[in-house]
UniProtKB/Swiss-Prot annotation:
Oligomer and partners: Part of a complex that contains DCUN1D5, CUL1 and RBX1; this interaction is bridged by CUL1. Interacts (via the DCUN1 domain) with the unneddylated cullins: interacts with CUL1, CUL2, CUL3, CUL4A, CUL4B and CUL5; these interactions promote the cullin neddylation and the identity of the cullin dictates the affinity of the interaction. Interacts (via DCUN1 domain) with UBE2M (N-terminally acetylated form) and probably with UBE2F (N-terminally acetylated form).
Tissue: Highly expressed in testis. Lower levels of expression in skin, thymus, spleen, lymph nodes, lung, brain, heart, skeletal muscles, kidney, liver an ovary.
A GO biological-process term: positive regulation of protein neddylation
Variant or mutagenesis effect after changing residue 219 to R: Does not affect phosphorylarion at Ser-41
Name listed for the protein in its UniProt record: DCN1-like protein 5
One Pfam assignment: Cullin_binding
Entries under Gene3D superfamilies matching the protein: Cullin, PONY binding domain, EF-hand
Keywords in alphabetical order: Cytoplasm, Cytoskeleton, Nucleus, Phosphoprotein
Length: 237
């Protein structure tokens, strides 16, 4: 989960693919090597008091974990801010804004996860990652990411943020992602609305990589119609 300071789009890290004659498309990694979590003796019960004290290690005077606190939190748990596990954690906490955790979000989410310290959260990493492999949970995470990442005074995602979030969510699983990314790079689109965002996931799950089963008369957004047309022209040129 990228840490927002001035609501700039998160960086796009880890290379995905390079199309002939076109620039490389890069995406962030799913995970980095994690330091081994210390064993927690005796299956300790969850402590709300301990969880709250843990929260205040990172929160500011406004009782919110902001960008600086988030960076320290990520460092302590051994996860890069742009790692997808941070997005899954934010989803579990039902965090409203990227780069911020309120006290209410922290307590509700960490109580659900039964985590009141760094070691317990590290022991839940495999569970958090497993949510990405569940079709229903992944769809919920994907949809959550739209509102999580957008500026709250805007109804749409700016295109740079959309590209970065799509890279994080679909970059390793959708065969056409690098091509779609290149299409967005050269397109006229400067924002992506919620309907377009939702349909990109459906498109990635149902349309073949060669586009052979794409229904031009289907109820796809114009953005995807234009993408298919653009790609077919490239394939025949």
């Amino acid at each position: 989960m990228p840490v927002k300071k001035k609501r700039k789009a998160p960086g796009v890290a880890a290379a995905v693919a390079e199309d002939a004659g076109l620039k490389k498309c890069k995406i962030p990694s799913y995970c980095r090597s994690q330091p081994p979590a210390r064993l927690i003796s005796g299956e300790e019960d969850f402590s709300r008091k301990k969880c709250l004290a843990w929260f205040y290690e990172y929160a500011g005077p406004d009782e919110v974990v902001g960008p600086e606190g988030m960076e320290k939190f990520c460092e302590d748990i051994g996860v890069e801010p742009e790692n997808i596990i941070m997005l899954v954690l934010a989803w579990k906490l039902e965090a409203e804004s990227m780069g911020f955790f309120t006290k209410e979000e922290w307590l509700k989410g960490m109580t659900s996860l039964q985590c009141d310290c760094t070691e317990k959260l590290q022991s839940r990493f495999d569970f958090l990652r497993s949510q990405l492999n569940d079709i229903s949970s992944f769809k919920n995470i994907y949809r959550y990411a739209f509102d999580f990442a957008r500026d709250k005074d805007q109804r749409s995602l700016d295109i740079d943020t959309a590209k970065s979030m799509l890279a994080l969510l679909l970059g390793r699983t959708w065969p056409l992602f690098s091509v779609f990314y290149q299409y967005l790079e050269q397109s006229k689109y400067r924002v992506m609305n919620k309907d377009q965002w939702y349909n990109v996931l459906e498109f990635s799950r149902t349309v073949h990589a060669d586009l052979s089963n794409y229904d031009e008369d289907g109820a796809w957004p114009v953005l995807l119609d234009e993408f298919v047309e653009w790609q077919k022209i490239r394939q025949t040129s």
